[in-house]
């Protein structure tokens, strides 16, 4: 299924964290934190400025981003879990 976000919304796929600590301890699913890192899968056209002009988004498809633990809205498409969030929910781009 193809999905194109509208306006300043972004489709992000979470990057799963390690299931083992550096010391070799296996972390059970119940103790794992939600990942705050993800890969941008699709972006909208941008947001409208106060003057009515379109302001393009800074993030682009393929960027690795950091976001707040509870950011975005969880959706499921084609058996995969994604987040739909606004550009304001993204804290930064990993380079």
Curated annotation (Swiss-Prot):
Signal peptide start and end residues: none
Record keywords, A-Z: Chaperone, Cytoplasm
GO cellular component, one term: cytoplasm
Keyword Chaperone: yes
Location in or out of the cell: Cytoplasm
Major localization class: cytoplasm
Record Pfam families: Cpn10
InterPro entries xref list: Chaperonin_GroES, Chaperonin_GroES_sf, Chaprnonin_Cpn10_CS, GroES-like_sf
Keyword hit for Nucleotide-binding: no
GO BP: chaperone cofactor-dependent protein refolding
GO molecular function, one term: metal ion binding
Family designation: Belongs to the GroES chaperonin family.
Primary role: Together with the chaperonin GroEL, plays an essential role in assisting protein folding. The GroEL-GroES system forms a nano-cage that allows encapsulation of the non-native substrate proteins and provides a physical environment optimized to promote and accelerate protein folding. GroES binds to the apical surface of the GroEL ring, thereby capping the opening of the GroEL channel.
Quaternary structure and interacting proteins, as annotated: Heptamer of 7 subunits arranged in a ring. Interacts with the chaperonin GroEL.
Protein name as catalogued: Co-chaperonin GroES
Species this chain originates from: Desulfosudis oleivorans (strain DSM 6200 / JCM 39069 / Hxd3)
Primary gene name: groES
């Amino acid at each position: 299924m193809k999905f194109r976000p509208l306006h300043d919304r972004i489709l992000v796929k979470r990057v799963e964290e390690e299931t083992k600590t550096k010391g070799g301890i296996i972390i059970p699913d119940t103790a794992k934190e939600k990942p705050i890192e993800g890969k941008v899968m699709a972006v909208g056209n941008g947001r409208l400025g106060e003057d009515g002009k379109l302001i393009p988004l800074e993030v682009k498809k393929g960027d690795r981003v950091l976001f707040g633990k509870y950011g975005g809205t969880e959706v499921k498409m084609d058996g995969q879990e994604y987040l739909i969030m606004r550009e304001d929910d993204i804290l930064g781009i990993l380079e």
